[in-house]
């Protein structure tokens, strides 16, 4: 059976993940593996290791980044309808809440992946886009939209726009999985350390997306 190492990214400064569009009023909820791999490749080049870049990137697997809270890990909701009921509630009372779920706590995810039906004790186990194994109101991150101004170099006209930052709880962050072992794993961890100092996402030049 394949084994994977968990790499945690903690103590994030405010983070904005681009959506591939020009608007900044919404930060993407997913940090995909190809984005992480590109960032690690950039760190490797920054360290002067420009040779064999393709062979390096193809020598290991790296997952997308998913949220965690302390030692509680979340995985993305699987495609298709998931079997979830809420004790004492009609489906019409919680259908909208189910549609908001984006990440599922790992123990519950494993049950759903086996085709089991989950019976929630309370609808409060759904917190925002998270499905929790117990009702304790944790929050991985909060979104804050602020107004900013862009000044064109050509016309010097000020154009306001909205920018969405994600603020992570101090006990929370993002994690990813890799199958790398030995010296290769050590190198990847060092690249993540450098990446944390540089930052992820948008506005790294003003301290955005830094982590430990």
Predicted stretch roles:
Residues 1-212:
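Conserved active-site/ligand-binding neighborhood in enzyme cores
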């Amino acid at each position: 059976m394949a084994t994977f190492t968990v790499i945690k990214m903690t103590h994030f400064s405010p983070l904005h993940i681009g959506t591939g569009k020009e608007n900044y009023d919404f930060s993407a909820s997913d940090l995909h593996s190809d984005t992480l791999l590109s960032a690690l490749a950039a760190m490797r080049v920054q360290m002067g290791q420009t040779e064999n870049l393709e062979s390096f990137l193809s020598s290991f697997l790296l997952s997308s980044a998913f949220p965690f809270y302390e030692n509680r890990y979340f995985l993305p909701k699987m495609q298709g309808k998931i079997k979830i009921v809420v004790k004492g509630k009609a489906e019409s009372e919680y259908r909208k809440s189910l549609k908001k779920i984006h990440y599922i706590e790992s123990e519950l995810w494993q049950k759903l992946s086996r085709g089991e039906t989950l019976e929630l004790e309370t609808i409060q186990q759904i917190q925002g886009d998270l499905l929790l194994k117990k009702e304790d109101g944790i929050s991985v991150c909060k979104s804050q939209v602020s107004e900013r101004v862009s000044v064109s170099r050509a016309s010097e006209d000020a154009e306001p726009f909205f920018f969405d930052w994600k603020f992570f709880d101090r006990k929370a962050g993002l994690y990813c999985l890799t199958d790398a072992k030995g010296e290769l794993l050590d190198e990847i961890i060092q690249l993540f350390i450098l990446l944390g100092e540089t930052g992820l996402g948008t506005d790294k030049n003003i301290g955005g997306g830094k982590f430990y």
